Amino acid sequence: MIETTKGGSGSYPIKTIVVLVQENRSFDHTLGWFKELNREIDGVTKSDPKSNTVSSSDTNSLRVVFGDQSQYVNPDPGHSIQDIYEQVFGKPWDSGKPDPNPGHPNMSGFAQNAERNKKGMSSAVMNGFKPNALPVYKELVQNFAICDRWFASVPASTQPNRLYVHSATSHGATSNDKKLLLEGFPQKTIFESLDEAGFSFGIYYQFPPSTLFYRNLRKLKYLTHFHQYGIQFKKDCKEGKLPNYVVVEQRWFDLLSTPANDDHPSHDVSEGQKLVKEVYEALRSSPQWNEILFIITYDEHGGFYDHVPTPVDGVPNPDGILGPPPYNFEFNRLGVRVPTFFISPWIEPGTVIHGPNGPYPRSQYEHSSIPATVKTIFKLKDFLSKRDSWAGTFESVITRDSPRQDCPETLSTPIKLRGTMAKENAQLSEFQEDLVIMAAGLKGDYKNEELIHKLCKETCVADASKYVTNAFEKFLEESRKARDRGCDENDIVYCVDDDDDHVVIPPQSHSEASNAAAQPKTQTSFFNKLFSCFIRHD
């Protein structure tokens, strides 16, 4: 049972903020063509075509015009920090010595980078969805608000950007940092700030939650804040028991029985549309509806084209930590623009939010705007980093004196865009590898380099999904045992092996804890360990 939510959020009518962060789609790719529905949107039109050449240094090379033919996208475009550098600045990343001052972000390298990664991919990268292809978003655009100046926090891949959503920093990560994935990222999060102030939060997961990237959320005291989405979310909505801060986590692995609904290519975005529809309708029918602000955004652009230059001036490093060599990224520029929705009965239909009015002259909307706005609405004491103190806040989207009574109760049924079945034998994406590494840390396999490597590089989606699920279930089981034995609520359970053994450790690194941990009784081979995990899960 979630504790009773706390009111008292001052002059704001919002007592519950719900956050859903989808995967890897740019603004133009997703909502650019929605300008035909609302001319206020900074999108794209046939009368003012946007384009890239396949060679940004040769103006006579093939020019690819941004189109409106997106449907099912496969494969996954490049979106590493190196790829994004080329997409944004129009010149390839120099692996020996990348330019720390690359100049104006002319957004001219998307087609070039796509062709460099795979011949013919520029067609997928330089296309967006027609509004009718995304019927759920079409209705949300017409009935609520979108922001057309929201940027990814880092010009990098999924995991660093997701870290900013709840902590306003990636703690120096620009891609998957295995050590930190195993140990958990140590920075303070908005979850702790809320908890310290007496507000409640809940994480509703459909697959082992990525919020366990944060080390502090692995503490025993936060176990009761994690809920199975399919069992608890609609129930809590119906009973009016949603906490003050709600995070909905998706299905990250594309399986035949449960297709991925995170919108990550090559997943079918119609599954993501179904998820948004389901979450919205549950919130809309809740007795808490008139106190809810629902935010949908995307972690990063996924390599897809966007025409708005990324901000490169005045962006503060959140905590003074630099990225890894050889670039030593200073976290002083943002990523590519991504779609963002604000949904509440306190918002006028068809609202378009552009850039923020402060708190600084060059402030922008980015993922750190979420904890910054949570701080504002709930009057929390401190910022998490220099980044959320700089980021624009969006409480001003609440403009009405009374809640609307005409918000749609249901949304349209999505259109299936993929003509094939889920590919369970596919290789893992980088983010799926991140989840596997995190799971190895939870399960106690952190020292088994061979196991981790094979899980990430030689295991298919279906088998990796089983491993992650098994690891999470083991972590929960051992954590519950430790809690029942009266262990300190600030401790973190450290699973030792495939037996029922565990040790409870304070918040310190796995490397420190390993000296005190019980060693496995037998050395299990990769295939036997994997097999035994799967049999136990099934």
UniProtKB/Swiss-Prot annotation:
Gene Ontology cellular component annotations, sorted alphabetically: plasma membrane
Record keywords: Cell membrane, Hydrolase, Membrane, Stress response
Induction cue: Induced by auxin, zeatin, salt and inorganic phosphate deprivation.
Top class in the EC scheme: hydrolase
Region (Disordered): 91-112
GO molecular function, one term: phospholipase C activity
Subcellular location: Cell membrane
Main location: membrane
Membrane topology classification: Peripheral membrane protein
Catalysed reactions, as listed in the record: a 1,2-diacyl-sn-glycero-3-phosphocholine + H2O = phosphocholine + a 1,2-diacyl-sn-glycerol + H(+)
Oxidoreductase as UniProt keyword: no
GO process annotations (BP): phospholipid catabolic process
Observed effect of gene inactivation: No visible phenotype under normal growth conditions, but mutant plants display decreased ABA sensitivity in seed germination, root elongation, and stomatal movement and have decreased tolerance to high salinity and water deficiency. Root hair elongation defects under low inorganic phosphate conditions.
Tissue expression notes: Expressed in root tips, cotyledons, on leaf margins, stems, young anthers and funiculus.
Enzyme Commission number, as recorded: 3.1.4.3
Task performed by this protein: Non-specific phospholipase C (PLC) which assumes major PLC activity during inorganic phosphate starvation. Substrate preference is phosphatidylcholine (PC), but can also hydrolyze phosphatidylethanolamine (PE) with lower efficiency. Has no activity toward phosphatidic acid (PA). Plays an important role in the supply of both inorganic phosphate and diacylglycerol from membrane-localized phospholipids during phosphate deprivation. May be required for lipid-derived signaling molecules that positively modulate abscisic acid (ABA) response and promote plant tolerance to drought and salt stresses.
Family per record: Belongs to the bacterial phospholipase C family.
Name assigned to this protein: Non-specific phospholipase C4
Organism the protein comes from: Arabidopsis thaliana
Gene that specifies this protein: NPC4
